[in-house]
Structures are given as C-alpha cells and as structure tokens.
Amino acid sequence: MKIFAYVDRSPFAESVWQHAVWVAKQLDFPIEIIHVLDQPASTPSRDYSGYHRFDNQQSAMEERIRLDELQNRVLIAEGRQLLDAIAESVREAGITRVSQRLYQGTLAEHLQQNASDCLVAVVGKRGEGAGQDSRHLGRNIERVVRSAHRPVLVVAKEFTPIKQAVVAWDTGKSSGETIHFLAKHPLLHGIPTALVHVSDNAEKLPAAIRDAQQHLETSGMDVIVSGRSGPVADAILQAVDDAPAQLLVAGAYGHSRIRNLVIGSTTTEMLMRSTVSVLVFHKYA
C-alpha cells in the first residue's frame, strides 16, 4: 500500500507533498504522486456532430477537434513535468520509494478505483480550479471526503510540523475505526494527542472514551481525554486552538453530535474554518 498525494498547480500542492512526506515517514510507506486530468486526453472536449451538414462547418469542426487534441497533449506534458518536479522534491526530503501517475478522470474516481492500494490519501483543501476564497472547499475535495473508503488528509495551505493532535471522538462506529487505525499505525506516535468528546454535559465523559484512551496508550501513544460542550464545530476547533494542535482527526459516522461533523453542514463548516490540516475517516474498510 501507498500514501497517495494528489497534486495540481494550486497553492496547496507544496503542502500536499510535504504532508505526504510526513505521513510516509511516520508510517514507513511509499508515496505515489498523482495528477488528475479531468478531461480525457483521447476525446474532444466538445460535441461537434451537428456541424456535419455543411463543408465549411465540417472544416471548422475538424480544426476545433485538432486544437482540442493539441491542448490535451499540452496538458499531459505539463502534468508529467509537474509530477517530475514534485517527485524530485519528495526524494530530496528523504523518501526513496516514490512513484508517479497521471490519471484522466476525477480524483474521486481514482481513489475509489485504487482504494485497495491506498493507506492514506492527501489532498489540498482546494484545487487549481476552485479559486482562492478560503471560505469555500473545492467541490472535488468535498466529494472525495464524503465518498472515500480510505482516510483523507485535507491539508492546510502551508505545512506546519505536527507537534500536537486533536481527535474528535464519539461512541459511533467510525470513531472506533479511527481509534483502531491510530492504534495499528504509528501515525501519531511521539505526538501528544487529545481525545475530545462533545456533548451537552462536558463534565460527564462516556466510559468508552477511557477504553479508547487505554487502547491508544497501549499502542505507544501519549493521550489525554477532554470533554467539551457547545456547537460541535466550535467546540472541536476551540480544542485545536487551546492545545494548540497542528492536526485534527475526525471520524464520520457516529450516532451522537459528532455524526454531523463530516456528513452534514458542520463538516463543511469545520473544514472551511480550520486553519490546521484535517484527517477525515468516512467509510474506512
């Protein structure tokens, strides 16, 4: 399995590969750098079939198809140059096991088709076509987060060394899978981590959170538990600020208030507002 690093020419590209390097070093896994071309290079981007009635329109159609094909060849060449440049940076950062892939389709399609070869997917909060407004997520990123069967690390614009982490925890299945992953893989070993539970009564913690803490500590992690109250996104992000943490980890499917963290509007709000990178577990399998 590999760490998938999805890169493009957005301002997040450098942060993506730097986070991927950090994950790869923590877990001792190779990196695959992937650049996705939304428009297949083998087909024209527009349908000109209606122009067949007239010779001059037929000539115009053929010229436009030729230009489309030329544009696609340019995009492929530029994509390969991007992959080569980032692969060189990754190797200079100390990762020797690096592969590259140019994929024609969508990011979500690639991850779904190759989930069995991926341990963690690393993506930027917004792609090169999403604009620069920090209040919005790229539509492709939101689609990936909601459908992925692998943990997705949505990175901040700049890489900051991970010295502390916050795990948003509830009693649902997804949080259990998150704890299992963190106990099995040394991603947060050596990094003080807070398990944070949000409820109406911050003083009353479920007994299961102590079990989760013990499970993680047995695996070698340094863990504390914390109860919070209030709106979920506000409470979690405040815990991140208070730590202060450079990484937030959140499961997706629970039956408590954390449930809305990743499957409803609260998730979008949290990802938009978070100034740190967020590792999201949705349907880990």
Placement of each model-derived feature along the sequence:
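Small/aliphatic-rich secondary-structure junction motif
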Residues: 1-65, 147, 160-227, 245
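Gly/Ser-rich helix-loop-strand patches that form or flank binding pockets
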Residues: 13, 17, 26, 100-159, ...
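Short Asp/Glu-rich motifs
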Residues: 43-44, 109-110, 134, 164, ...
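Alpha-helix-centered segments that form part of catalytic cores
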Residues: 66-88, 98
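A short, acidic, amphipathic alpha-helical segment used as a generic capping/interface helix at domain edges
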Residues: 213, 231-242
